[in-house]
């Protein structure tokens, strides 16, 4: 993919000031989804990057990680595993809590979704603090999966999530970077 393709993807992401609260510049990935060419280019970029790496599963985090992880898994010919908030998955699950700016949240994964030795790619729309992906990585590893890569459409490097995830041994890839919070 060319620099023009990445520029097209980045340009398709709208920035919404003071959402969800004053002082935040929200990066709205749903505007990318509305642009079929940008959405397709995003998935193709991820396919091109990860197609020969031997992944057996793609894990996407609730909810926007599903929008990029599921089509990527299909293109890679591997299964897709959702990581969700508590009470949303019907089979047996394990849970991992993580800290938010003002509180704690929890994620769950089906206990039979990852088998020992699965090589897993984690996908989400945006990397900020890295808390969601840290919790997701812990869940995958608890089930015996091998996770060394995390892919994002957007990274906000000033927040430091990429460094946090690298500290967990993850190779972090993002298509676009934006300044700010």
UniProtKB/Swiss-Prot annotation:
Keyword Glycosyltransferase: yes
Annotated GO MF terms: adenine binding; adenine phosphoribosyltransferase activity; AMP binding
Keywords: Cytoplasm, Glycosyltransferase, Purine salvage, Transferase
Subcellular location: Cytoplasm
UniProt catalytic activity: AMP + diphosphate = 5-phospho-alpha-D-ribose 1-diphosphate + adenine
Oligomeric and partner information: Homodimer.
Family label: Belongs to the purine/pyrimidine phosphoribosyltransferase family.
Purpose: Catalyzes a salvage reaction resulting in the formation of AMP, that is energically less costly than de novo synthesis.
Protein name: Adenine phosphoribosyltransferase
Organism whose genome encodes this protein: Vibrio vulnificus (strain YJ016)
Gene (name only): apt
